[in-house]
C-alpha cells in the first residue's frame, strides 16, 4: 500500500484580505513498508539535536533555527553555527534517502476566482490531487491511503470532514 501525506502551502484567504497569491497542495507518496524506518531516522535526528524525539519539525522552525537569523523565532533555535550546519547536513541526507514521489497542485487564486468566483480553491486542488494519486496507484497496481495534515493554518479546514465524503 502507498501512503499519501497531503499538506498545503498558502491559504484560501482572498488577496484583498492579505491572502497569498498561490495555494499549493502537495502530496508525498511513500510505500507503507518505509514508514517506520523513516520515522525512526527522523526521531533519531530530533533526539540528537534537541534531546526530544517528539519535538515538532516544520520548515519555518528549521529555517529560523539558523543562528545567523537573529530575528527568527523558532522552538528549534540553535545558537551554535556548527551545530546548525550539522543539523542541515543530517536533514538533507535524511530527505535525500527517502524514496518518495511528490505530486503538487498550484492554484493562482486571482485567476481561479475570476473563473470560479464562488468555489473554494482548496476543494479544486484536492480533487485534482486525488485524481493524480489515483492515476499513480493504477500505474503501480497498488492501493493507497490519504493522510491530510489536520492542523489549521491559514486554510479553512473546519468544513473538510463532511465535504471530503462528497469528494470521495
Task: Give the location of each predicted region.
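Phosphate-ester processing/binding pockets and catalytic centers
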Residues: 1-168
Amino acid at each position: 500500500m502507498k501512503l499519501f501525506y497531503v499538506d498545503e502551502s498558502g491559504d484560501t484567504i482572498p488577496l484583498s484580505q492579505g491572502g497569498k497569491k498561490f495555494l499549493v497542495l502537495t502530496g508525498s507518496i511513500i510505500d507503507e513498508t518505509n514508514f517506520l524506518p523513516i520515522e525512526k531516522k527522523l526521531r533519531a535526528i530530533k533526539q540528537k539535536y534537541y534531546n526530544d524525539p517528539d519535538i515538532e519539525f516544520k520548515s519555518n522552525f528549521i529555517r529560523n533555527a539558523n543562528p545567523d537569523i537573529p530575528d527568527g523565532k523558532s522552538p528549534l533555535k540553535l545558537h551554535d553555527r556548527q551545530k546548525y550546519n550539522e543539523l542541515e547536513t543530517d536533514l538533507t541526507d535524511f530527505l535525500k534517502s527517502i524514496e518518495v514521489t511528490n505530486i503538487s497542485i498550484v492554484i493562482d487564486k486571482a485567476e481561479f476566482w475570476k473563473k470560479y468566483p464562488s468555489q473554494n480553491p482548496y476543494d479544486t486542488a484536492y480533487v485534482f490531487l486525488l485524481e493524480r494519486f489515483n492515476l499513480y496507484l493504477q500505474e503501480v497496481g497498488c492501493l493507497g491511503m490519504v493522510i491530510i495534515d489536520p492542523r489549521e493554518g491559514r486554510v479553512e479546514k473546519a468544513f473538510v470532514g463532511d465535504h471530503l465524503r462528497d469528494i470521495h
